[in-house]
A protein has these predicted regions:
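Active-site glycine-centered loops adjacent to acidic/histidine catalytic or metal-binding residues
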Residues: 12, 105, 139
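Conserved small/polar residues in nucleotide/adenosyl-binding loops
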Residues: 143-145
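Short, ordered loop/turn segments at secondary-structure junctions
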Residues: 40-43, 107-108, 141
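Ribokinase/PfkB-type carbohydrate-kinase core domain
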Residues: 49-135
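Short glycine-/small-residue-rich flexible loop motifs, especially phosphate/cofactor-binding loops
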Residues: 25, 92, 140-141
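Small-residue (G/A/S/T)-rich helix-start motifs and N-terminal tracts that mark the onset
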Residues: 1-76
Length: 145
């Protein structure tokens, strides 16, 4: 029996399907990769902008991470929108234990220009998550940050 490679995305949602975990899962599927997702934030957005962001509870975030990592071992992990320091602090121990490639996509600003991450979270990301990444995939507009 042939098994598909498995990848995990940890990010926010995008109901329009153009970004976030929805886009990640479509990308995985297009490459014949079995995709799993842990949702960090629920984002109401469209092509006109971001209307509302609600972060999942710490309890829910931890439960999703435990559910995935206790069952199916990903062969690659990608993080996207990690909007708060608290979210990053919960995820970081899982990233430290990885024995697979980790892709860090530092999503800080929506395509519409709306800010998705605060200054303290940006600093935490640079100091604590950047060193763990196998590869970093910032948008061109974020390279100077």
């Amino acid at each position: 029996m042939t098994y598909l490679p498995v990848a995990l995305t940890i990010a926010g949602t995008d109901p329009s399907g153009g970004a976030g975990i929805m886009a990640d899962l479509k990308s995985f599927q297009a490459r014949d990769v079995y995709g799993m997702a842990v949702v960090t934030s629920l984002v109401a957005q469209n092509t006109r902008g971001v209307q509302l962001i609600e972060h999942v509870s710490n309890q829910m975030l931890k439960a999703q991470l435990e559910s995935v990592f206790s069952d199916i071992k990903p062969q690659a992990v990608k993080t996207g929108m990690l909007a708060t320091t608290e979210i990053m602090e919960i995820i970081q121990p899982y990233l430290k234990k990885l024995d697979c490639p980790y892709v860090l996509d530092p999503v800080m600003v929506a395509t519409s220009g709306d800010t998705l991450i605060d200054a303290s979270a940006r600093s935490y990301l640079k100091t604590n998550l950047l060193p763990l990444a196998t590869i970093i995939t910032p948008n061109l507009s974020l390279i100077h940050i």
